[in-house]
């Protein structure tokens, strides 16, 4: 055997050996992971845990007696950096103010949570719902009725999250 053919033979043998060893290492890793518990969630059926501070779909809350919490102070409208909130209010016979129009443009909203922090009566909150995809842009213009409906649907989860989050405010 000549010197170059010997080198070629050794390189070929070494390359085959490394390929085989690496292949075996890959099989070992694959077998190891095959018998470990799975970390993937099957999303629509299983959902991962949400942080108590998660900011999702907006909702307007009511008091336990059914009265709206919003006192039309308009702090949320003023503090909103995206100018996504529009409020119109009128005074009632008893002297208190209530909203006649409360609109949120969810397309503009940046989910910063400033509206929730500014509200003195916890009327506007960002709930736990993150699945609110729509087919048209118009469906993302939330009016007062839609926001109140969200509040009724998610009230238990919202109250629990606010209770968990209370020490941090």
UniProtKB/Swiss-Prot annotation:
The signal peptide stretch is none
The processes (GO biological process) annotated in the record are:
aerobic respiration
Q: Where does [4Fe-4S] cluster 2 bind?
A: 80, 109, 112, 115
> Which stretches make up the 4Fe-4S ferredoxin-type domain?
60-90, 100-129
Record-listed E.C. numbers: 7.1.1.-
Topology relative to the membrane: Peripheral membrane protein
Bound cofactor: record note: Binds 2 [4Fe-4S] clusters per subunit.
Q: What class of enzyme is it?
A: translocase
Q: Which HAMAP family match?
A: NDH1_NuoI
Physiological role: NDH-1 shuttles electrons from NADH, via FMN and iron-sulfur (Fe-S) centers, to quinones in the respiratory chain. The immediate electron acceptor for the enzyme in this species is believed to be ubiquinone. Couples the redox reaction to proton translocation (for every two electrons transferred, four hydrogen ions are translocated across the cytoplasmic membrane), and thus conserves the redox energy in a proton gradient.
Oligomeric and partner information: NDH-1 is composed of 14 different subunits. Subunits NuoA, H, J, K, L, M, N constitute the membrane sector of the complex.
Record-given protein name: NADH-quinone oxidoreductase subunit I
Q: Provide the organism lineage as a comma list.
A: Bacteria, Pseudomonadati, Pseudomonadota, Alphaproteobacteria, Rickettsiales
